[in-house]
């Protein structure tokens, strides 16, 4: 591809600086060579265009790698609008490169929560030829924010009083205010959106958790594909991606030497495993906290100390939350930490650390060091450093996962979007996982790039195992 952005005049975007488009295009060209799976799928479907004219809204970190995903969806026919799924994760040159080609994108690094949710609404607002405002036919979600907004808006139009209940957080208050405004400005809008909405593919653990909660309550409005639990996503993006990007975020934020430090990793799922491995590779002494006896045993078998967070206070130099749960690090924990401790999160949402409560605490001085690095000084003179306001440190303070591992995830996303559209009339309103043969195909598409040569089963060997020579090779219940 040409490394100079081909600018298409249009104003349907909100970004930081369109002049960054050429820089973004150069980095996109580099990323494409590191994303063999996604590019292979793009080439395979470029002529048939299985998503021709399908309206797709994306809510996913507006990075260089995501830009390659967006252009893949466009090349196979989709009509795309995009927003980021985090206020700090946008790479402004990536957003500019996409906006310059005529794709509506609404994202910049350092949005307020009000701006973030306005951008989400902009991304899911399509205009029909007759001027009617409607929504997407498919959604690419990361964390479930678009899915949440549509469901809550539709419930409001059908008598829900949720928006009138007291907000449990500042962000919930912002969402409720937005829904009230839409109810006045666009009566009946969410019913029109739901009428055409055919499905969602969800990228991350937290968003999948939301989907299953909605489905179990009997309120899921559309079929959903759980991309996160494809093996080539969770065991690669979550694990190997974090193994590289966590240390990158810490280094860029604090320029700190990790060797010899005591690092506390809260949670030992796939993200926790990658985070613990990242810190240990740099020579940190890693302590893991866990609620799950199986994960705790795994951590111990890997040689990590497994203990409670309370036992680490006063000796931990670095704290990383990875759980997808709330209130993992409380204000009381923060006050009891070692002077100059570094605190960050690599789970999707910002509620793993009690940031709102910290900001409301009397007698605490907040000093901004640089973007996404804040020092909090307590009354006793001790201080902690909070990175990215408790949001994703690898995207807030660095550039997220490398392109190669994201090619796995985004290949799955693209296949999920095609699958949802092709089966839009047969899928039920429940959560699906992509079939095993597609999981294996995604892996296969990445092997040549890294010099892997597979052994081939003989027919006799395949019969002995009870599998096809071409796979799938493992049953659905197999745990990789």
Swiss-Prot record:
Which controlled-vocabulary keywords does the entry list? Answer: Cytoplasm, Hydrolase, NAD, One-carbon metabolism
Q: Which residues participate in NAD(+) binding?
A: 204-206, 238, 267-272, 290, 325, 346-348, 394
Catalytic activity, EC: 3.13.2.1
Pathway per the UniProt entry: Amino-acid biosynthesis; L-homocysteine biosynthesis; L-homocysteine from S-adenosyl-L-homocysteine: step 1/1
Q: Does the keyword Membrane apply?
A: no
Cofactor, free-text remark: Binds 1 NAD(+) per subunit.
Per the record, what are the reactions this protein catalyses? S-adenosyl-L-homocysteine + H2O = L-homocysteine + adenosine
Kindly list the positions annotated as binding substrate: 63, 142, 203, 233, 237
Q: Which GO terms describe its molecular function?
A: adenosylhomocysteinase activity
InterPro entries per record: Adenosylhomocyst_ase-like_sf (IPR042172), Adenosylhomocysteinase-like (IPR000043), Ado_hCys_hydrolase_NAD-bd (IPR015878), NAD(P)-bd_dom_sf (IPR036291), S-Ado-L-homoCys_hydrolase_CS (IPR020082)
Cofactor dependence = NAD(+)
- Name the source's superkingdom: Bacteria
- Return any one Pfam family short name: AdoHcyase
Single GO BP term: one-carbon metabolic process
Q: What does this protein do?
A: May play a key role in the regulation of the intracellular concentration of adenosylhomocysteine.
Family the entry assigns: Belongs to the adenosylhomocysteinase family.
Name of this protein: Adenosylhomocysteinase
Origin organism is Xanthomonas campestris pv. campestris (strain ATCC 33913 / DSM 3586 / NCPPB 528 / LMG 568 / P 25)
